[in-house]
Structure formats: C-alpha cells, structure tokens
Amino acid sequence: MFSVKWGELYFNVVMEGGKAVKSYFSTYPSFSSSDSEYARQLERYFSGERVEVRIPYRLKASSFTRRVLEEVSRIPYGMVRMYSDIAKALNTSPRAVGQAVKRNPLPVIIPCHRVVGKKEIGGYTVSCSDIDGKSLKKRLLRLEGVF
C-alpha cells in the first residue's frame, strides 16, 4: 500500500499479493510513500511525463464490469473514447458502460477518466466528498494533453 502526492491531492493504492485491488484520490495520504517501481511510475505520470501506468491488478467485479474495464484499459495515454464506442464494441448500451465504469475500483490504473460522452465530458466517481469528480476528470485529461 502506498500514497503518491499530486498537487494538493494524494493518489492511494491498496495492494494485495503484489497486485492492486483498489485505488482512490484523497486530500490526505492514506499510506506512506514508497520507492517501489509502481510508485515511481505514478510519480512520473502525475508529474506530466507520458507514462502508460502498468501496475498489475486483480479485479473484484462482475463479468460484465470486468469486460467493460478491460476495454477501457486499452485506451492509450492522451486519447479518449466515447461511452457509445465502448458499448458498440461490447454489444451493449452506453448507459450500461457508464454504470460499469462508475464501479471501477482502480481509477488511473484502469483509465476510466479517458471515457467521455458525445456532448460532454461525463462524470467521474470519487470516494472523497472534498473532491469534485468532474473537475478531477478534466484535470487528468489536461495532464495527458487531451484539452
């Protein structure tokens, strides 16, 4: 388990058996920092370096959510896909994709911030009430040069 600072926020990763099982943003560090390769990878990412975050993970999710998140994990750094594109690839509805993305236990590691709506950016679920999800999504996309 480790926390990485990003401006006024912290990105926290829970590891079990060498795999990430949960990640989340907070306004305080949940864990100590780490000099692990995974922490260094995230530090580089949050400093604006073009880094594909490659942290092994274990998903605790339904088979449908797992399929959606596997599709989301293929979206490259600096790119976005619409909910409708993912829905078409998986033969389902954009709304169902949105619900699965909302349940992503591993934001950034599985880059759900790269999924957007046709007319607007779409939401971004965060577990900390002090953080506005939509603003955080925009900030992550700006970091990757999308905006």
Curated annotation (Swiss-Prot):
Keywords: Cytoplasm, DNA damage, DNA repair, Methyltransferase, Transferase. GO terms for molecular function: methylated-DNA-[protein]-cysteine S-methyltransferase activity. Pfam families: DNA_binding_1. Its EC number is 2.1.1.63. Coiled coil: none annotated. The keyword DNA damage applies. The active site is at residue 112. HAMAP family: OGT. This enzyme catalyzes only one turnover and therefore is not strictly catalytic. According to one definition, an enzyme is a biocatalyst that acts repeatedly and over many reaction cycles. This is Methylated-DNA--protein-cysteine methyltransferase. It comes from Archaeoglobus fulgidus (strain ATCC 49558 / DSM 4304 / JCM 9628 / NBRC 100126 / VC-16). The lineage of its organism: Archaea, Methanobacteriati, Methanobacteriota, Archaeoglobi, Archaeoglobales.
